[in-house]
Design a protein with these regions (language model features):
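Active-site flanking residues adjacent to catalytic metal/cofactor-binding acidic residues
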Residues: 33, 124-126
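Short, contiguous clusters of charged residues that form electrostatic/catalytic patches at enzyme active sites
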Residues: 66, 124, 153
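A broadly conserved detector of short glycine/acidic/proline-rich loop/turn motifs that flank catalytic sites
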Residues: 26, 94, 104, 120, ...
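N-terminal entry segment of metal-dependent catalytic domains or homologous docking segments
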Residues: 1-55, 87, 91, 96-115, ...
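C-terminal catalytic subdomain
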Residues: 1-2, 16, 117-120, 130-181
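Catalytic core of PPM/PP2C metal-dependent serine/threonine phosphatase domains
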Residues: 47, 53-101, 159-179
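Short, surface-exposed beta-edge/turn micro-motifs
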Residues: 27-28, 76-78, 119-121, 170
Length: 181
């Protein structure tokens, strides 16, 4: 099982522009779209990505990636994720980030597949979310948190201390692998 917590906050902006689409099935499949103010992305394209993610439980990850690529070709900042209690597969482009806390160490996740173990923690987020954080903050909050929600709360408190959540949209997902559940 993958415990997860999703944050979507408009920050100091008039509207929330990023998108997170999720499919909960035997594996958790997700698309995170980072839309800075200057980015243009149509509602129809957004709906197409959402529909593909919703139908993705019967697709291989590479097929999903190939299906969304023509839609997202002009959007420079996005991430596709498929995670279960054994592996995570990521495809990220632009200013979106994925980190894993494994055996007390923080590492940036590369594109492709990575093995997971019980208790591993993963954060996927936009560049705006990362702006006020550093590796030590992410790692220390991950190791002291008992849940994905608590980890997110701790990170948001750090961001709030720096900018009172008054700047851009904040989008992130924290995940904890719970193999025994």
């Amino acid at each position: 099982m993958i415990e997860n917590y999703i944050l979507m906050h408009k920050g100091g902006q008039e509207e929330y522009r990023d998108s997170v689409f999720v499919n909960y099935s035997s594996a958790l499949t997700m698309a995170i779209l980072y839309l800075p103010v200057e980015a243009e992305f149509s509602v129809a394209d957004e709906a197409s990505v959402q529909a593909l993610v919703q139908a993705s439980s019967k697709m291989r990850f590479t097929d999903l990636s190939e299906s969304v690529y023509p839609i997202l070709t002009n959007l420079r900042n996005y991430m596709l994720i498929r995670i279960d209690d054994k592996t995570i597969n990521i495809e990220r482009h632009g200013k979106v980030f994925a980190y894993i806390v494994q055996s007390g160490e923080l590492k940036m996740l590369p594109n492709g597949m990575t093995s997971l173990e019980d208790g591993d923690r993963v954060i996927c987020c936009t560049g705006e979310f990362m702006r006020c954080l550093n590796d030590i903050a992410i790692l220390s909050d991950a190791v002291v948190s008992d849940s994905a929600e608590e980890w997110m709360d701790n990170l948001v408190c750090r961001i709030s201390d720096k900018n009172r959540l008054s700047e851009g949209n904040l989008t992130a997902v924290t995940m904890i692998v719970r193999s025994g559940d």
